[in-house]
């Protein structure tokens, strides 16, 4: 039976990597997120405090109707805390569906109204914690998650929100402990996914895949959670260079949830890895059109570059910058993701270094370390870059992009032998790790 907690890995590590989220991680939203659930108070068992059941999610794609229904309900009764809390979470799901950040202020208003109506409402508190994760306000998410945990100690999700925030803040042993407790309180897709991420960050990729398969089982065939788990398994497979395995998971995701944008993103990556650039561009464009988030538009730009269409690629890069501005105007902190993107394309290097420093201060994780080191290296400040990129590798994470960044800094500093060693390591981990940088590594080793 695969291990269910990351505790046994802690002896090797002092801290753990951040998602990005995911994520894009989106996730990120929450790092393991894309798993936002409907928060609903339940009757307390005889021996327990009131608890929250957070796994009964509104079906993705069906929330427009739910939003209209809930908006009507709160117009009839403006102090219905339960309906206000559900509305706040439905707005978050609409953000996931559409990429429209204007739903996030609406979510905040609904959840705060719920708390005014019922000041100790755990569901609304945790909804605000989820919102803080989406906005990358990790210190705020930590405080709200802890408050929700105090109010509903027998619910699993508050432990997840607290753990997600702690990971982004670089407090990994504490984050692991929260994930352990979450799994003990309520084994679920959400808890197994966090265990998978913890194992991935500590270099246990086989264990990560095993835990994500448990998450897939826990999804129970429900379309969106099942598709999401398949997408995460596809990402793990691509990170190991297993293109055929990734393709199988993408097909499974799209079979159960046709048009799922996260699966379309991975389908484009699979097509590119197989040399099918035309198909990859078409699929990436479909994802970027459906949900215009930076990760999808940036992928399309990279694919267009690979196709030899620099003008079209530049247009997509400009679109990413515009989307970042809209996200920031709606309260999302995208400094880290923006810094990595700008460093990739050498956009105003000195300004990018300042952005990366600010991002790392907000998110003192190893991905924060990597973003700052990469920005410094791309700005030609190689000696400054190397210590940060070493810190980014301190957990033993098997990540080709981290290896490539370290090699680039070594080459920039004049140590071509070390550069080649790091590039070789990146390609051995996954020869398809990046459409932009894998060819650079191969050329340097030729």
Task: Map each language-model feature to its residues.
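TPR-repeat structural position
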Residues: 63, 97, 104, 138, ...
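Residue-level recognition of tetratricopeptide repeat
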Residues: 89, 93-96, 130, 164, ...
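Start-of-helix register in tetratricopeptide repeats
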Residues: 82, 89, 123, 157, ...
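Canonical tetratricopeptide repeat
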Residues: 86, 127, 161, 194-195, ...
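Register position in tetratricopeptide repeats
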Residues: 93, 100, 134, 168-169, ...
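Short coil turns that delineate tetratricopeptide repeat
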Residues: 78, 119, 153, 186-187, ...
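N-terminal leader/linker segments that initiate helical-solenoid repeat arrays
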Residues: 4-117, 123, 143, 431-432, ...
């Amino acid at each position: 039976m695969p291990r269910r907690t990351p505790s046994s890995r802690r002896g090797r590590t002092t801290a753990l990597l951040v998602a990005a989220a995911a994520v894009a991680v989106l996730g990120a939203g929450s790092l393991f997120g894309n798993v936002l659930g409907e928060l609903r108070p339940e009757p307390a068992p005889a021996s327990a405090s009131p608890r929250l059941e957070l796994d009964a999610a509104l079906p993705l794609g069906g929330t427009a109707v739910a939003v209209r229904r809930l908006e009507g309900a709160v117009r009839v009764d403006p102090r219905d805390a339960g309906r206000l809390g559900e509305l706040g979470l439905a707005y978050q799901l609409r953000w996931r569906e559409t990429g429209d950040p204007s739903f996030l202020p609406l979510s905040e208003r609904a959840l705060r109204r719920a708390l005014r109506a019922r000041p100790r409402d755990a569901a609304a508190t945790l909804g605000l914690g989820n919102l803080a994760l989406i906005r990358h306000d990790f210190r705020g998410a930590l405080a709200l998650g802890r408050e929700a945990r105090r109010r509903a100690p027998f619910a699993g999700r508050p432990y997840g929100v607290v753990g997600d925030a702690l990971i982004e803040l670089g407090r990994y042993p504490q984050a692991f402990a929260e994930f352990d407790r979450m799994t003990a309180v309520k084994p679920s897709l959400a808890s197994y996914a966090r265990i998978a991420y913890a194992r991935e960050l500590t270099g246990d990729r086989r264990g990560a895949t095993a835990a994500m398969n448990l998450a897939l089982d826990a999804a129970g065939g429900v379309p969106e959670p099942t598709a999401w788990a398949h997408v995460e398994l596809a990402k793990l497979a691509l990170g190991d260079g297993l293109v055929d395995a990734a393709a199988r998971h993408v097909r499974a995701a799209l079979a159960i949830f046709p048009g799922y944008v996260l699966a379309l993103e991975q389908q484009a990556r699979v097509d590119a890895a197989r040399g099918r650039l035309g198909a990859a561009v078409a699929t990436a464009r479909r994802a970027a059109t459906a949900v215009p988030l930076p990760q999808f538009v940036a992928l399309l730009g990279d694919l267009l570059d690979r196709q030899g269409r620099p003008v079209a690629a530049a247009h997509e890069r400009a679109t990413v910058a515009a989307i970042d501005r809209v996200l920031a105007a709606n309260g999302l902190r995208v400094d880290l993701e923006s810094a990595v993107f700008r460093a990739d394309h050498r956009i105003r290097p000195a300004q990018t270094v300042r952005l990366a420093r600010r991002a790392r201060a907000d998110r003192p994780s190893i991905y924060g370390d990597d973003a700052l080191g990469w920005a410094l290296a791309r700005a030609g400040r190689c000696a400054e870059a190397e210590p940060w990129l070493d810190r980014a590798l301190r957990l033993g994470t098997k990540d080709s992009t981290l290896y490539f960044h370290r090699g680039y800094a070594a080459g920039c500093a004049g140590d071509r032998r070390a550069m080649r060693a790091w590039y070789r390591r990146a390609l051995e981990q996954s020869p398809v790790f990046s459409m932009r940088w894998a060819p650079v590594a191969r050329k340097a080793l030729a």
